[in-house]
Swiss-Prot record:
Disulfide bonds join 35-72, 65-262, 73-265, 197-349, 252-285, 274-422, 278-410. The modification Phosphoserine is found at residue 352. Heterodimer; disulfide-linked. Cleavage by a furin-like convertase results in production of alpha and beta chains which form a disulfide-linked heterodimer. Interacts with DPP4. Interacts with FGF2. Interacts with WNT5A. Also interacts with WNT3A and WNT7B. Interacts with hedgehog protein SHH; the heparan sulfate chains are not required for the interaction. Also interacts with hedgehog protein IHH. Interacts with CD81. Interacts with Wnt receptors FZD4, FZD7 and FZD8; the heparan sulfate chains are required for the interaction. Belongs to the glypican family. It is a lipid-anchor; GPI-anchor. Glycans are attached at residues 124, 241, 418, 495, 509. One of its GO terms (cellular component) is lysosomal lumen. GO terms for biological process: cell migration; cell migration involved in gastrulation; cell proliferation involved in kidney development; coronary vasculature development; mesonephric duct morphogenesis; negative regulation of smoothened signaling pathway; positive regulation of canonical Wnt signaling pathway; positive regulation of endocytosis. Residues 555-580 form a propeptide. The modification Pyrrolidone carboxylic acid is found at residue 25. It comes from the Eukaryota. O-glycosylated; contains heparan sulfate and/or chondroitin sulfate. Cleaved intracellularly by a furin-like convertase to generate 2 subunits, alpha and beta, which remain associated through disulfide bonds and are associated with the cell surface via the GPI-anchor. This processing is essential for its role in inhibition of hedgehog signaling. A second proteolytic event may result in cleavage of the protein on the cell surface, separating it from the GPI-anchor and leading to its shedding from the cell surface. This is Glypican-3.
Length: 580
């Protein structure tokens, strides 16, 4: 009986010693002789097992995962791996750009709506000015003002409208109404058919003085900069979308497959690609994309220059919210010269003025309904200009986005960072050698040739668009100090109008006019301040490779500490029986 027990214990001890190898033994198991693990892995990618051999095969038909011996991969499996590798790459690119893309999309929407709010406020201010001071000019004035600000909105959105024509049309339309309703109320009906003559006389006689030219200058400069700013943001979105959905070359697809999936064919499920090998592959695959980096950097810096100059007459918020004051001054100018104008226009338009000029009552101090023109007094951080500066600071943190993409992809995919016991695209190696890996790849892929092919056509197109917008941004950017230049002061501003805080700049030049701060509250009217986690597509799914590695990592941890302790206990009991 004792002999039987001793024999049984010896057998159990031998089996346990085989089941629990020492720590010094290499962790990777030998290739699966039955391809069972490979079949389990592949079924996660492709339901059904008809493409997976039950036992290793020669693999003579393989084109990417070239075997050095029997393999558990077929040609169909290889094709599926290539497709999956490309999808993994696209997903990693989208994950890399998620925060940047949402930042630009969010701000493009915020600023577009904010500009529309500014236009709407400016129209309301101007209508209120007419209603409270020139009621006889409404509703005609309301119609002309509405058309003008509609054109302003369309121009900001990119419509092919000439700003000078917009301003001329406004004053051409206003003057006949001012002449017949304000300067000559009670004009006979027979004399009301001179509108075309009055429109022409308005320009010939400069009846509004230099105010139309002043408005042209202010509105043109501010709207041009605003439009370029929005165009630049929209192009930024287009650039990110383009690189998010790049179709990589066949050579790149093969390289990715060798790196991520060819190890499966040898049954090496737990082995990760070498970090250095990943860098080599990504530099080859993304050589064309990285060429965007130079123009992307210039894009952000040029946009910063533009934003730094967007104040005073280059700030549409400042200009449009003060426009009602300038229009009022222009009408006041007409009234001051009404006598001379009436005589001259009477001769020019062949209209004999039988009655003495009678001007409508006009109060000395402009009264504006403060309830209509009320603008919330807000903190500096909530203004348009501060929001623009905040955007630029965030964009500058992404200035190296494209040059850093290869490193990002490798750091966010399963790789062996220390380059030990890792997959080099052909076999499991104790330590990765870049030179050896490059030499081993020459028979399959020429990395130098891949880089020299240049960027894909779609990347070349986006680079051309970046060059164009960068040129526009440089053209529209205001050199530092130019806003306080003497030439601009002559256009209707005094150098003392603005302090260090450009958000305090105001428009208008009339004495006694109510000054309207160009500060609009964002938080009350715009609700775009979302967390990045709320962005569409922010919940990125793990790549198939990640899921597989995680699953099989758990499967590989069968030798738990509890089982190890159990084996030790059994060994002690057996030793006791053997001794006794």
């Amino acid at each position: 009986m004792a002999g039987t027990v001793r024999t049984a214990c010896l057998v159990v001890a031998m089996l346990l010693s085989l089941d629990f190898p020492g720590q010094a033994q290499p962790p990777p198991p030998p290739p699966d002789a039955t391809c069972h693990q490979v079949r389990s892995f592949f079924q996660r990618l492709q339901p059904g097992l008809k493409w997976v051999p039950e036992t290793p095969v020669p693999g003579s038909d393989l084109q990417v995962c070239l075997p050095k011996g029997p393999t558990c991969c077929s040609r169909k499996m290889e094709e599926k791996y290539q497709l999956t590798a490309r999808l993994n790459m696209e997903q990693l690119l989208q994950s890399a750009s998620k925060e940047l893309k949402f930042l630009i999309i969010q701000n493009a929407a915020v600023f577009q709506e904010a500009f529309e709010i500014v236009v709407r406020h400016a129209k309301n201010y101007t209508n209120a000015m007419f209603k409270n001071n020139y009621p006889s000019l409404t509703p005609q004035a309301f119609e002309f003002v509405g058309e003008f600000f509609t054109d302003v909105s369309l121009y900001i959105l990119g419509s092919d409208i000439n700003v000078d024509d917009m301003v001329n049309e406004l004053f051409d339309s206003l003057f006949p109404v001012i002449y017949t309703q304000l300067m000559n109320p009670g004009l006979p009906d027979s004399a009301l058919d001179i509108n075309e003559c009055l429109r022409g006389a308005r320009r010939d006689l400069k009846v509004f003085g230099n105010f139309p030219k002043l408005i042209m200058t202010q509105v043109s400069k501010s709207l041009q900069v605003t439009r370029i700013f929005l165009q630049a943001l929209n192009l930024g979105i287009e650039v990110i979308n383009t690189t998010d959905h790049l179709k990589f070359s066949k050579d790149c697809g093969r390289m990715l497959t060798r790196m991520w999936y060819c190890s499966y064919c040898q049954g090496l499920m737990m082995v990760k690609p070498c970090g250095g090998y990943c860098n080599v592959v990504m530099q080859g695959c993304m050589a064309g994309v990285v060429e965007i980096d130079k123009y992307w950097r210039e894009y952000i810096l040029s946009l910063e220059e533009l934003v730094n100059g967007m104040y005073r007459i280059y700030d549409m918020e400042n200009v449009l919210l003060g426009l009602f004051s300038t229009i009022h001054d222009s009408i006041q100018y007409v009234q001051k010269n009404a006598g001379k104008l009436t005589t001259t226009i009477g001769k020019l338009c062949a209209h004999s003025q039988q009655r003495q000029y009678r001007s409508a009552y006009y109060p000395e101090d402009l009264f504006i309904d403060k309830k209509v023109l009320k603008v919330a007094r807000v903190e500096h951080e909530e203004t348009l200009s501060s929001r623009r500066r905040e955007l630029i600071q965030k964009l500058k943190s992404f200035i190296s986005f494209y040059s850093a993409l290869p490193g990002y992809i490798c750091s966010h995919s399963p790789v062996a960072e220390n380059d030990t016991l890792c997959w080099n695209g052909q076999e499991l190696v104790e330590r990765y050698s870049q030179k050896a890996a490059r030499n081993g790849m020459k028979n399959q892929f020429n990395l130098h040739e891949l880089k020299m092919k240049g960027p894909e056509p779609v990347v070349s197109q986006i680079i051309d668009k970046l060059k164009h917008i960068n040129q526009l941004l440089r053209t529209m950017s205001v050199p530092k100090g130019r806003v306080l230049d003497k030439n601009l002061d002559e256009e209707g501003f005094e150098s003392g109008d603005c302090g260090d805080d450009e958000d305090e700049c105001i428009g208008g030049s009339g004495d006694g006019m109510m000054k309207v701060k160009n500060q609009l509250r964002f938080l009350a009217e715009l609700a775009y301040d979302l967390d990045v986690d709320d962005a569409p597509g922010s919940n990125q799914q793990a790549t198939p490779k990640d899921n597989e590695i995680s699953t099989f990592h758990n499967l590989g941890n069968v030798h738990s500490p509890l089982k190890l302790l159990t084996s030790m206990a059994i060994s002690v009991v057996c030793f006791f029986f053997l001794v006794h």
